[in-house]
């Protein structure tokens, strides 16, 4: 969580007993918002880097893993995802991926800190290229309140593209929030939530899955994918719904939009459960 004199940014993951470093060319921006401290760097090999409160949020080089896996698996699992709600996602990369789906008619994005979006527009314009799409609707405010006050059965898919479960994001990982999401979705809706590293944050992942079930989602499945700049380099997202077996494989195979990581084989492979995860799921 520091830029040392030799020009390296290092994020220390204390719970994992590890650190990740990137060589920095220059610091482009830093500011304190009402919610957090945001820094933008130009790295030597990973493009631009966004850091929030000392934690890496995204890099220009590898963000496509995260954004594609937060969007396409859930959208190709829902039978007809017309109405999408994104909680968080201020860098707009997930929004860009969602809007690649022609079936989507409306996307609402609720980000608590507008400055994240404005800085993404300036320093990561490639992620924000769909922000002017008429299907995109931006709300800057509390995602918990938005979900609690939204009408029942008003969305088909909820994507929770949140930071780690600390501070203002902590409530997004609790059963009461998932219950509100379930009310918005109804029986056919599906939720996906970024769920940290299964290697380092296994206790959190298991608790999160349990909270989803307490919130009214009978089926829960976790998918995994590489993410170099996050702790351990291995990340996950967890799907929740009443049924998660409707993979529209034919549509995914015939997709006409470009992706850099996601395809049908990746979709299937990401849902394969490593044995240590299977054992913890069976015992929970």
Swiss-Prot record:
Keyword terms of this UniProt record: Cytoplasm, Polyamine biosynthesis, Spermidine biosynthesis, Transferase
Cell compartment(s), UniProt: Cytoplasm
GO terms for cellular component: cytosol
Domain PABS residues, every copy: 6-242
Pathway annotation from the record: Amine and polyamine biosynthesis; spermidine biosynthesis; spermidine from putrescine: step 1/1
Binding-site residues, S-methyl-5'-thioadenosine: 36, 111, 142-143
Domain of life of the native organism: Bacteria
Protein name per UniProt: Polyamine aminopropyltransferase
């Amino acid at each position: 969580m520091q830029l040392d004199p030799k020009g390296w940014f290092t994020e220390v993951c204390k719970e994992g007993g590890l650190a990740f470093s990137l060589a920095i060319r220059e610091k482009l921006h830093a500011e304190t918002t009402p919610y957090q401290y945001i820094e933008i760097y130009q790295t030597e090999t990973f493009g631009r880097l966004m850091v929030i409160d000392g934690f890496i949020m995204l890099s220009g080089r590898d963000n496509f893993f995260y954004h594609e896996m937060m969007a396409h698996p859930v959208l190709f699992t829902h039978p007809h995802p017309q109405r999408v709600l994104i909680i968080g996602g201020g860098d707009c990369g997930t929004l860009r991926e969602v809007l690649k789906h022609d079936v989507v008619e409306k996307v609402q994005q609720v980000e608590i800190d507008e400055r994240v979006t404005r800085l993404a527009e300036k320093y990561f314009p490639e992620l924000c290229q769909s922000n002017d799409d008429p299907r995109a609707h931006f709300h800057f405010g509390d995602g918990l309140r938005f979900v609690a006050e939204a009408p029942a059965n008003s969305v088909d898919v909820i994507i929770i593209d949140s930071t780690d479960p600390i501070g203002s994001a902590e409530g997004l990982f609790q059963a009461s929030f998932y219950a509100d999401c379930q009310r918005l979705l109804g029986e056919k809706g599906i939720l996906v939530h970024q769920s940290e590293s299964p290697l380092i944050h296994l206790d959190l992942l298991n608790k999160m899955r349990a909270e989803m079930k307490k919130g009214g989602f009978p089926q829960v499945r976790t998918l995994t994918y590489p993410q170099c700049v996050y702790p351990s380099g291995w990340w996950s997202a967890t799907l929740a719904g009443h049924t998660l077996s409707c993979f529209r494989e034919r549509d995914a195979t015939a997709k006409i939009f470009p992706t850099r990581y996601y395809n049908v084989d990746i979709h299937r492979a990401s849902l394969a459960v490593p044995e240590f995860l299977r054992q913890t799921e069976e015992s929970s």
